[in-house]
A protein has these predicted regions:
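Glycine-/small-residue-enriched transmembrane alpha-helix faces in small-molecule transporters
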Residues: 1-39, 146-173, 181, 193-195
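Specific transmembrane alpha-helical segments of multi-pass solute transporters/efflux pumps
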Residues: 18, 22-23, 51-101, 137
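Hydrophobic/aromatic residues within transmembrane alpha-helices
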Residues: 29, 38, 42, 88, ...
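Structural motif at transmembrane-helix junctions in multi-pass transporters
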Residues: 30-38, 82-102, 176-182
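C-terminal transmembrane-helix exit sites in multi-pass transporters
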Residues: 49-61, 104-129, 202
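Hydrophobic transmembrane alpha-helices of multi-pass small-molecule transport proteins
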Residues: 50, 71, 111, 120-142, ...
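Loop-to-transmembrane alpha-helix entry segments
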Residues: 61-69, 98-101, 117-137, 147-153, ...
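Conserved small/polar residues in nucleotide/adenosyl-binding loops
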Residues: 215-217
Length: 217
């Protein structure tokens, strides 16, 4: 077994901080721009950064060869769950969103077991059970009342996590050997095209130009 080094711990903390802060920014921006319009801006921003790298490194051929599976994964890993989380961020806090996001490994393992017949060891099952119980304990706070829209937001976030877990399994089983850059950039491209008409329809009447929320996108 590999020993966990200080660098491994530092990288985990750094990535956790980045991932966790995204929910805070989502909470700040989603009520301002609206969920779908916000996500369209985010995927377009990501595509603008990665597309030059794809062209420069010659990864476009990989996307062209595997575009059908990349498109399928992008819907389950970007377009739909991003919008679900953005909708949830309008009604529940960033802390709760990050807790719900912790169910992604649980859903991923369940999909692997049910769909791909992967065997889970007793220790894996025990870990999943403990993780699930931990999320339930943190989620059901007796001192907090969500209301009907709050519970709908929680369900939306859970569905997003289920889609993430499904996308992970699709990627592992169908996109082996394809570069992460091609998958990510291709996914952003497909997601931006799929969301474009919905974003145009759901765009805010007045764009908050000069608003600090623009920085958080």
């Amino acid at each position: 077994m590999k020993r966990v080094s200080l660098r491994d711990i530092s990288e985990l903390i750094f990535l956790s901080a980045i991932w966790g802060s995204s929910f805070l920014f989502l909470r700040l921006t989603s009520p301002v721009f609206g969920p779908i319009f916000l996500i369209e801006m985010r995927v377009l921003s990501g595509l603008a950064v990665l597309l030059p790298l794809v062209l420069f490194l010659g990864k476009l051929a990989e996307f062209q060869k595997h575009w059908k599976m990349i498109a399928t994964v992008s819907l389950m890993n970007m377009a739909i769950p991003f919008c679900f989380f953005a909708f949830s961020a309008v009604y529940i806090g960033a802390g709760l969103l990050s807790i719900i996001n912790a169910t992604v490994p649980i859903f991923s393992a369940c999909v692997a077991y049910v769909v791909y017949k992967e065997r889970l060891s007793r220790s894996s099952l025990l870990g999943l059970l403990i993780g699930f119980l931990g999320v339930v304990v943190l989620l059901f706070n007796p001192d907090e009342s969500f209301g009907s829209l709050g519970w709908l937001a929680i369900l939306s976030a859970l569905l997003a996590c289920l889609l993430y877990g499904t996308a992970i399994n699709l990627t592992v089983n169908n996109l082996q050997g394809v570069s992460g850059l091609a998958i990510t950039a291709g996914g952003l491209f497909v997601s931006s095209l799929v969301l474009l008409p919905f974003a145009f329809w759901a765009r805010p009447e007045v764009l908050p130009v000069g608003n600090l929320s623009l920085i958080h996108i």
